Swiss-Prot record:
<keyword id="KW-0521">NADP</keyword>
<dbReference type="GO" id="GO:0050311">
    <property type="term" value="F:sulfite reductase (ferredoxin) activity"/>
</dbReference>
<keyword id="KW-0349">Heme</keyword>
<dbReference type="GO" id="GO:0070814">
    <property type="term" value="P:hydrogen sulfide biosynthetic process"/>
</dbReference>
<dbReference type="InterPro" id="IPR006066">
    <property type="entry name" value="NO2/SO3_Rdtase_FeS/sirohaem_BS"/>
</dbReference>
<dbReference type="GO" id="GO:0019344">
    <property type="term" value="P:cysteine biosynthetic process"/>
</dbReference>
<dbReference type="InterPro" id="IPR045854">
    <property type="entry name" value="NO2/SO3_Rdtase_4Fe4S_sf"/>
</dbReference>
<feature type="binding site">
    <location>
        <position position="432"/>
    </location>
    <ligand>
        <name>[4Fe-4S] cluster</name>
    </ligand>
</feature>
<dbReference type="GO" id="GO:0051539">
    <property type="term" value="F:4 iron, 4 sulfur cluster binding"/>
</dbReference>
<dbReference type="GO" id="GO:0050661">
    <property type="term" value="F:NADP binding"/>
</dbReference>
<protein>
    <recommendedName>
        <fullName>Sulfite reductase [NADPH] hemoprotein beta-component 1</fullName>
        <ecNumber>1.8.1.2</ecNumber>
    </recommendedName>
</protein>
<dbReference type="InterPro" id="IPR006067">
    <property type="entry name" value="NO2/SO3_Rdtase_4Fe4S_dom"/>
</dbReference>
<feature type="binding site" description="axial binding residue">
    <location>
        <position position="475"/>
    </location>
    <ligand>
        <name>siroheme</name>
    </ligand>
</feature>
<keyword id="KW-0028">Amino-acid biosynthesis</keyword>
<feature type="binding site">
    <location>
        <position position="426"/>
    </location>
    <ligand>
        <name>[4Fe-4S] cluster</name>
    </ligand>
</feature>
<dbReference type="GO" id="GO:0046872">
    <property type="term" value="F:metal ion binding"/>
</dbReference>
<comment type="function">
    <text>Component of the sulfite reductase complex that catalyzes the 6-electron reduction of sulfite to sulfide. This is one of several activities required for the biosynthesis of L-cysteine from sulfate.</text>
</comment>
Length: 564
């Protein structure tokens, strides 16, 4: 640790009494609908962000009212598996006790509830506890919800990998009893709090972990601080290749921030998984930047000390030496929409959920549809990192009923294009306080325009990975797209191109801070060139690199911000 002044977040964590703060006082305060001072940040460690409806913010200011404070709550669902019973409990709460009545499936395989008023916060935590769930560590400077490839076909390997995702999640959770005391009204335990892995100040910044089963890269391993690539022998999981230091967030105008691909460390057998996970987290805990949060993520620690030095420290702390990497390859990221049969003889139905938003609308009552399926389904639900949902483990005798319900509620759409399936957006307006431009709300129309251009140039059956994020923080994973938009201001975006379908290359800035008409003009020119000059089977991202329309990002810390 240097002599530089620590960021204020470090003070509030250290002084929080292991994440308790004075949250209870704010809950009892009838004069405000929100949390103030340090508690505004501390509730994140309990799985919540304070938000307000930005569509009506100015109107409320004019009326001399405080913003309409609510919280967004994330459930902890390692690997995205949830039972129908649990789903129905969350569905009912969203319908009856949130301002928006929706459920948002995230690209980290969990659900968010937006618009929870302060009086309903304790009840929702108690509901989750009753359902066998919680929201611990789904936000804040801790290890977040652990991802796992939602592979519905390789069911044996998936089950084994998911079990490890669950073990990693549990092992790295905060040990403090604050969550139970504050939200579940549990009595304070006399035994002193201790955080043997995370420490009293927790981590320098958020930490993301994923388990991935090749050839699927649906979890986007290069968006994660720590990734475990499943290595199987037949249908048996034997170990993991370990990757470190991925991450996509950056700060506009700050060239010391950048997206970064993860570094391969080596192979470990299963028995060493938790020891390696703990050693990686504790090394980042001790070596990460606590003075400047912009440079506090693990990717910057690796760049500052060197990947080899970081790796050696992980080996020293864990007592485990990495073996050479086992071969693996990624060939796809998207979900297989529709029915597939698993090797266990069960059927699995993947349903496309636009932007992960479940909300009954005229002609598309998709939230009610999932609830109807949950009432009759005997398997489980699996949320995907592409914001979709898998009705998993359907017996052959039940397949027709599930299929009929999906069609009745508009959840199976034969006209769904490849481009729409390959597109994603973060939430952005109206609830995200960091949003600079629209994302989720404009995605349907933007994709329709792209579909029109693809058909115009004779490639209507083709697609490219397309993502919009309302700010540079990376939630929409635009920095692993073939075409990515990052919001700069209302109606203005920066256009990045040159990623690939596999999610193993970072795109480069092509046009900065352009308005929407200019954006579509540029995309049209690129689609026209791709349609005319591409090689057989050549993806859009690979084409713009080969055609030298844009130069590839080879080493992001060095060349991401280079003008080429």
């Amino acid at each position: 640790m240097s002599d530089k002044k620590l960021s204020d977040n470090e003070r509030l964590k250290t002084q929080s009494n292991y994440l308790r703060g004075t949250i209870q006082d704010d809950l009892a305060d009838p004069l405000t609908g929100g949390f103030v001072a340090d508690n505004f940040q501390l509730i994140r460690f309990h799985g919540m962000y304070q938000q307000d409806d930005r569509d009506i913010r100015q109107e409320r200011i004019a009326q001399k009212l405080e913003p309409l404070h609510t919280v967004m709550l994330r459930v902890r669902l390692p690997g995205g598996i949830i039972t129908p019973h649990q789903w129905l409990g969350i569905d009912a709460f969203a319908r009856e006790h949130t301002l928006y009545g929706s459920i948002r499936i995230t690209n980290r395989q969990t659900v968010q509830l937006h618009g929870v008023l302060k009086d309903d916060i304790k009840p929702v935590h108690k509901l989750l506890n009753h359902l066998g769930l919680d929201s611990r560590a789904t936000a804040g400077d801790v290890n977040r919800n652990v991802l796992c490839t939602a592979n519905p076909v390789e069911s044996v390997l998936h089950r084994q990998s998911w079990e490890w995702a669950k073990k990693i999640s549990e092992h790295l959770l905060p040990r403090t009893n604050a969550y139970a005391e504050v939200w579940l009204d549990k009595e304070k335990i006399i035994q002193p709090d201790d955080e043997p892995i995370l420490g009293k100040s927790y981590l320098p910044r958020k930490f993301k972990t994923a388990v991935v089963i090749p050839p699927q890269n649906d979890v986007d391993i290069h968006a994660n601080d720590l990734s475990f690539v499943a290595i199987g022998d037949g249908d048996q999981l034997v170990g993991f290749n370990v990757l470190m230091g991925g991450g996509l967030a950056m700060t506009q105008g700050d060239t010391s921030t950048y997206p970064r691909l993860a570094t391969e460390f080596g192979f470990i057998p299963l028995a060493h998984t938790l020891a390696i996970a703990e050693a990686v987290v504790s090394t980042q805990r001790d070596w990460g930047n606590r003075e400047n949060r912009r440079n506090a993520k693990t990717k910057y620690t690796l760049e500052r000390v060197g990947a080899d030095v970081f790796k050696a420290e992980v080996e020293r702390r864990s007592g485990v030496t990495f073996s050479p990497l086992k071969p693996y390859v990624f060939s796809e990221r998207g979900d297989r929409i529709g029915w597939v049969e698993g090797i266990d003889g069960k059927y699995h139905l993947t349903l496309f959920i636009p932007s992960g938003r479940l909300l009954d609308k005229p002609g598309l009552p998709n939230k009610s549809g999932i609830a109807a399926i949950a009432r009759v389904h005997n398997g489980d639900f699996r949320l995907t990192a592409n914001q979709n949902i898998i009705i998993a483990g359907v017996a052959s005798d039940d397949k027709a009923q599930i299929d009929a319900l999906a069609r009745q509620y508009g959840l199976l759409d034969s006209s769904l294009s490849s481009q729409r399936k390959d597109s994603m957006a973060c939430v952005s307006f109206p609830t995200c306080p960091l949003a600079m431009a629209e994302a989720e709300r404009v995605l349907p129309d933007v994709v329709s325009q792209i579909e029109h251009l693809l058909h115009k140039y004779g490639v209507g059956d083709e697609s490219f990975v397309f993502r919009i994020t309302g700010c540079p923080n990376g939630c929409g994973r635009a920095m692993l797209a073939e075409v990515g938009l990052i919001g700069r201001a209302v109606g203005r975006y920066s256009l990045y191109i040159g990623g690939n379908r596999e999610g193993t290359r970072i795109p480069r800035l092509y046009k900065d801070n352009i308005d929407v008409p200019t954006l579509f003009d540029e995309i049209e020119k690129l689609i026209a060139l791709w349609a005319k000059e591409r090689n057989i089977g050549e993806g859009f991202g690979d084409f713009v690199i080969r055609a030298k329309i844009i130069m590839p990002v080879i080493n992001a810390p060095v060349d991401f911000h280079t003008a080429v």
